[in-house]
Swiss-Prot record:
Principal place of residence: nucleus
Source species: Arabidopsis thaliana (Mouse-ear cress)
Record's protein name: DNA (cytosine-5)-methyltransferase DRM1
Pfam families to which the protein is assigned, alphabetical: DNA_methylase (PF00145)
GO cellular component entries: nucleus
GO BP field: defense response to fungus; DNA methylation-dependent constitutive heterochromatin formation; methylation
Subcellular location: Nucleus
Comp. bias intervals (Acidic residues): 166-185
Matching PANTHER family: DNA (CYTOSINE-5)-METHYLTRANSFERASE DRM1, DNA CYTOSINE-5- -METHYLTRANSFERASE 3-RELATED
Amino acid sequence: MVMSHIFLISQIQEVEHGDSDDVNWNTDDDELAIDNFQFSPSPVHISATSPNSIQNRISDETVASFVEMGFSTQMIARAIEETAGANMEPMMILETLFNYSASTEASSSKSKVINHFIAMGFPEEHVIKAMQEHGDEDVGEITNALLTYAEVDKLRESEDMNININDDDDDNLYSLSSDDEEDELNNSSNEDRILQALIKMGYLREDAAIAIERCGEDASMEEVVDFICAAQMARQFDEIYAEPDKKELMNNNKKRRTYTETPRKPNTDQLISLPKEMIGFGVPNHPGLMMHRPVPIPDIARGPPFFYYENVAMTPKGVWAKISSHLYDIVPEFVDSKHFCAAARKRGYIHNLPIQNRFQIQPPQHNTIQEAFPLTKRWWPSWDGRTKLNCLLTCIASSRLTEKIREALERYDGETPLDVQKWVMYECKKWNLVWVGKNKLAPLDADEMEKLLGFPRDHTRGGGISTTDRYKSLGNSFQVDTVAYHLSVLKPLFPNGINVLSLFTGIGGGEVALHRLQIKMNVVVSVEISDANRNILRSFWEQTNQKGILREFKDVQKLDDNTIERLMDEYGGFDLVIGGSPCNNLAGGNRHHRVGLGGEHSSLFFDYCRILEAVRRKARHMRR
């Protein structure tokens, strides 16, 4: 008994002074001896409330040792009073103190569990109910129960809202028993079915669409709900532990939304009808390769000159319909770059290129995270099932976040609790974090992003560009392997080289793709507003010993009809007009400022259409 008590002393000190809440109270170590235990002298006195006659019979060193063990002075005084006798041995007092601890240990442990979940944002009554049903030891079961309660509350609130807001004509909106609606869900893709189901459960369409995109097309309903819940938990965690000035700002924003937003009426319109598998008209090593477009290109849009326009796939409602209507009503080709590399990048492409005899640039990229970055395998936990990264963004996770994750994981020597796993996985998917050490996650560096996007090493490095600008430029760029696969059909058509009008060039993704396809670029007229990006393209042009002409414009407005006609007369016309709008106003990661094609950057699409029409009009005149 005494020997196990000595071991318990060290365990108590860890709980009282350490960060870990996961303490193993069981031990088989019976080799410790009380004779080896030394009291540390320290001038600590118990409170004056203890009787003087008792205090005088206990040495200061003994009292100090009890305090160092973590016992309060009030508890020590009480133990001394109860054991007051002729002998007054310290061992008897220690036994009494341990009895006090044992009686409060269970309630203290239970309180820690309750406080843990309340801090994560769960209601106290839900936590208590879950612990009554599942006990206080199985954290995973408690977490699942709490998530279930949250979903039930959401569904109930959604149903209440429907009763209060909607008239009889809207009653069927939230009824899954409707035969027509069931048929529609059965005929739609897995993503569409999950999206509709989540909307019926009361989730915002934006949140649901982003979660589905992040989790992947094959994710189950449970995985998507877990992702949304983890996102909500993370937001609540940030609000709880935010610095005072940030917390006040969050609260003010909440109040502002409460007073300014009007209730949203349920909307049955689709964001956009995206294919279940984003393989476009076909991708390498995948069945379903098409030899002909499902909807032929209108005669008025046939090339040459050819054109190629890219934008993000997940856009606000109606955006792709508007893009298509301005580009000769050509049906978009939606492709996810995960079929070409280890990172997803869902994009839509409208072009008039042939689709037969496409080929992949060599060597092809590695297809999984572990193949692309083999050093991560050693540290990758079994509960992180990712093989692909999500879309590469223009910003990265903060060092504070990765530090917070490391601290959370280091609290547990054994199996990481399910709730912690879910939170970590949410942050990993959101920020594309990879494992670089034990319990250590890090965002991709710019060199790794270059590799995934298909650019040559150090393509964006040096030349005065900052790390922040590198991330921004890479996040808005083409995925070279994907674009090269589409442009590969041009190689046999232009054996003597090609003239390119490159609009919103960025860091030269289109030019890199043509170079890797070994298609000679006779002329490239580039329009790019960023000085850093223009420097990157110019450096690439020089380092790859291009023999053609590179002519640069900073302002797209300078490319009026007269300038375009003069350039075409000078260079003999353009064979390819390539471009794409930065995704700042369209992408889910920037949803707070998302305004569709009317945004500051995405409205450049209309300049693309204006210039393309001028090029095609001049080309018709030149052919006469």
